Amino acid sequence: VDSQIIDKTKLIYLTYPNNPTGSTATKEVFDEAIAKFKGTDTKIVHDFAYGAFGFDAKNPSILASENGKDVAIEIYSLSKGYNMSGFRVGFAVGNKDMIQALKKYQTHTNAGMFGALQDAAIYALNHYDDFLEEQSNVFKTRRDRFEAMLAKADLPFVHAKGGIYVWLETPPGYDSEQFEQFLVQEKSILVAPGKPFGENGNRYVRISLALDDQKLDEAAIRLTELAYLYE
């Protein structure tokens, strides 16, 4: 990144495991970011919403890096790891000045959350430490099985290191939106086209692993029937 741009940057927003790509970060990635911006006016926000899903290695926290709390906060969500999607329950920890600023902003933009949801979140955090690992193992098993079926049919995909999605490359002659429509009409499979996620996503569609094994297996079988499109 151009040094002049960095000099004017007030906030760096990181998210690992990344949504939408599923890429993960090592501790060295965070160490480098902290070293670069420590002592400057630039702060770092790390969105750790998919932190529970580290399939090939445990996902590091930016706050575990030396001086992490000097420049960063980390945002946690109960939506994915604790199956509380839609309830909008989460929290932030880290640099005290950033937390105070966030608290001041939230006071003027948020009227509060239904108390029962807060109680449920607190109970989950206090009593289900092993649940996140169980969740990760469930999705790892799904990923391994789904990707193995795609690989057996020589379908090109991006190996998912984290998150809950698999990216399938589109066949020649199809962009992401065209292939998404084809899958709906011909195979009754609903995926997300990659184009809305950025120009580089236009040759891919995103497939969610948040389905039971039987449905994922059936989706994989239907996809493998399209191997001829890639020839």
Tell me the role of every PLM-derived stretch.
Residues 39-40, 153, 187, 230:
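Helix C-cap/helix->beta junction micro-motif
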Residues 2, 173, 182-191, 197-231:
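PLP-dependent enzyme catalytic core of the Aspartate aminotransferase-like
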Residues 65, 69-140, 144, 148, ...:
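Conserved core segment of the aminotransferase class I/II
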Residues 1-8, 20-44, 48-84:
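Active-site pre-lysine segment of PLP-dependent enzymes
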Residues 153-157, 190-195:
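A short linear hydrophobic-aromatic micro-motif
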Residues 122, 138-147, 157-169, 201:
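Conserved glycine-rich beta-strand-loop-beta hairpin in the small C-terminal domain of fold type I
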Residues 13, 46, 191-193:
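Hydrophobic residues in well-ordered beta-strands that form the structural core
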